[in-house]
Amino acid sequence: MERVSITERPDWREKAHEYGFNFHTMYGEPYWCEDAYYKLTLAQVEKLEEVTAELHQMCLKVVEKVIASDELMTKFRIPKHTWSFVRQSWLTHQPSLYSRLDLAWDGTGEPKLLENNADTPTSLYEAAFFQWIWLEDQLNAGNLPEGSDQFNSLQEKLIDRFVELREQYGFQLLHLTCCRDTVEDRGTIQYLQDCATEAEIATEFLYIDDIGLGEKGQFTDLQDQVISNLFKLYPWEFMLREMFSTKLEDAGVRWLEPAWKSIISNKALLPLLWEMFPNHPNLLPAYFAEDDHPQMEKYVVKPIFSREGANVSIIENGKTIEAAEGPYGEEGMIVQQFHPLPKFGDSYMLIGSWLVNDQPAGIGIREDRALITQDMSRFYPHIFVE
């Protein structure tokens, strides 16, 4: 795997504006970067595909185990009054759309799973669409090796999945929601709306605080239309604790992502994976912080509900060598053996490996100058060659 410098497209900012990529710069710092790209081999892509598929199936085995155990539901911090709702979502095979595994890998040895973003993964639009446009433009300009391709079937698979949701599950109208003042989330929602529209599903967007509760206990939109199918870019760990959580089970909504995803988007997944698949080559040793576990010289402490690296700390010989602030931690912690992210130049690189409908669908690569990848990371495109 190589990081290769390349000339930026002179008009990429205009293209970003034209295509509605409104978060290519965030907080005054570049997010989308194309002064370089990552070059993989076909064998490396096949390895990522194989590992991603296997890890995902292992995660589904965890759901099966947790659903069947009150003790584990408690350990995963699923509120007791929502157990039936979460369990039924799994037992009735509620469909999912997509997820992203974060992997540490430099192209040699085995990729290591750092975490599973199974509920509200972002960086989708730039991985699925904008880096593909970059590939086409740079190929046409003759700036890439002949025969360059990209590990990226995301858009095609998303549209195909929406067609399945319409034909097999009756998704005629899909509401989509996120929080206000979140330009990246809004961009992700807009992209998914476009994919659903391509699949001939009608869509309606509303902000999460605009969702109402009708007289019959059903959720409604601003036009008092009953919400039957809802894609939410809003975490289950919040929803299961809010006032309306008691209404979830009887509201008759088909959720994307389904409630069973609350189990595998949760860092408690990592210790259970290690317990169920000990010494698996793509896993790192991980344990619940409060449980007895082997001492580790260098490890990472992660809150069960942490997002974007918040409240994650790296410990070496009992001392904190790096830490990120945030609002998480009261829910409990897990510890995971430290595994260094590959370093290219002065930045650390993280691979986000995407799945759509349980199938590997491509990657997005982010860089961060800090060891803990946060929401100010930078996205770089990639290619592969045979």
Curated annotation (Swiss-Prot):
UniProt entry keywords in alphabetical sequence: ATP-binding, Ligase, Magnesium, Metal-binding, Nucleotide-binding
InterPro entries, A to Z: GSPS_pre-ATP-grasp-like_dom, PreATP-grasp_dom_sf
Molecular-function GO terms, alphabetical: ATP binding; ligase activity; metal ion binding
EC number: 6.3.1.-
UniProt keyword annotation of Membrane present: no
Functional description taken from the UniProt entry: May be a ligase forming an amide bond. Shows ATPase activity. Despite its similarity to the C-terminal synthetase domain of Gss, is not a glutathionylspermidine (Gsp) synthetase. Cannot synthesize Gsp, glutathione (GSH), or GSH intermediates, from GSH and spermidine, cysteine and glutamate, gamma-glutamylcysteine and spermidine, and gamma-glutamylcysteine and glycine. Does not bind to Gsp.
Name of this protein: Putative acid--amine ligase YgiC
Organism of derivation: Escherichia coli (strain K12)
